[in-house]
């Protein structure tokens, strides 16, 4: 790796301009950028800034993230088959966040804030107050309160979505009990996971792969009367320290996976759950219910090595590595929960799955059979209608559109059918409202949503935890981008005798656990003519990409050190 540490880059804006931007009678979030020109790659930067090196930033590794995104482009299929239905995705951005200033956790209806930078005490309120309808605050009200009410200054106008600070984290599927199921009398099960956990991030390393630029973006909040020149000096020092960190990062020496045990649940039990879900459909309770199952693996795993393996073998529109103290979320999700850019709301329902073939010809044959399957088409159309209804809840009347319908997207082990639903956000709504309107995705619950969630609660033996929720961000400007947590794994590290992560699914203590617990989960949409064995096989295919990435670093840990770019998902 080529390094060019010499020279002294400058923080923009300069000291006096920064102070001028910060001047005012209200808290202000002021944007400043620092160019990073040392030839660093995203994985290397994450490793350095998350404290993996001996000279890492103190405590930064407890909360850090790596998010990588991709854009749609026209298909490059040389044969033109299914064009324009077949599309691929290519990388645009990578984001590395480190050293957050607060952590907000919502659990059992209570929001707590861990203030990591004393200057943010009092700026964040996870109590949430009352919701818009006067009811007690829910998880989204609490997250809204975790984003300080501050004027944005120094932010450029731009025509695309970009994370340059704000709230980053996950909203677990189990938040449905707070948002929906408590109202219909469904008891919340015991869970090892919070409903939500987000960091307030003010330091983001932004990689623009299309432009070849790497910048460290600061978005600190300054109070009225605060010494802005002193804060600027601190940012310069922090920028130079971070630049020095990444410039001295050695080639990655990532670990692998040493498995000690694995449990997958009973195939017969899952197929019985499918039959019971089918009975609900035939009885008219639901049109569809998404029933999931999990695999639990135990052993010692390096999350960064795992992510690198998944990134290379299963590149996807949403790649993420979230390190939250003793819980890490690693994933390669193909599906948007909701995206908000300015006043545009976007949902991308994915429904319809078939395996990849042995080559382009078989890929096209299998995709054609999927598109011609009446069951797949009916299921997809139903979920597109559900997405339209979700978006309509927060959109201006008459603005909801289906922009793309039944595109085929290719991934490492499967092909999916995707559509795009858009709407214009109503003037009195924000990103948190949009998240609430679309959460959980109908593709992870079924339809109608509330009754389908009740069926899922009755049929699945363990709480879903993070699976089926959302992972992503709400930026300072109100933009948001959250992926559905699928094709993902949670890694729970031993937390000691008092650690919450040492609690088993049945609520018993697991104080002797000294290895990581890795949970991989997948589901299938159950309708009237579902065949239990086929639905089980679909969950196996959906888990395959994540399990293969683990097995790859188990067989050969050194292979995970390859820092391959996020290439097109259809390769």
Describe the role of every protein-language-model region:
Residues 2-571:
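Extended alpha-helical targeting/anchoring segments
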